[in-house]
């Protein structure tokens, strides 16, 4: 299967794995045979982590991640990867600011996304 991304520069190092010939589930989407790529407790502060947005960055990838605490409350964290499979997750939560630049941490950060506008990425 060929992967075609529209309106973006070529990504020659994007990790991709073909669906195994013996894959029997009817799901139309094949992911990766060794999922999950991030296990439980990736840092002492995070009980579970979910990939929400990954983008190519410099010589690898960055991701904004929903990291659920032991109490179930999610916050946003930043991850770095050279290959898109093996990740290092920062221990500090991503700091947010309001329109005036004042610190404003969301009480519940769920399903963050990255949007690139010109040369700047924004977390929404």
Mark where each language-model region is:
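Beta-rich carbohydrate-recognition and catalytic domains
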Residues: 1-107, 115-124
């Amino acid at each position: 299967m060929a992967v075609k991304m529209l309106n973006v520069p070529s990504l020659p190092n994007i990790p991709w794995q073909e669906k195994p010939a013996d894959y029997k589930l009817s799901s139309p989407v094949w992911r990766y045979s060794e999922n999950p790529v991030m296990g439980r407790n990736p840092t002492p502060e995070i009980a579970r982590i979910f990939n929400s947005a990954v983008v190519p960055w410099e010589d690898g990838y960055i991701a904004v991640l929903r990291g659920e605490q032991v109490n179930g409350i999610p916050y946003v964290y930043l991850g770095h990867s050279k290959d898109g499979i093996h990740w290092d997750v920062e221990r500090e939560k991503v700091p947010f600011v309001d329109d005036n630049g004042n610190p404003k941490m969301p009480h519940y950060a769920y399903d963050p996304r990255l949007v690139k506008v010109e040369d700047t990425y924004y977390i929404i």
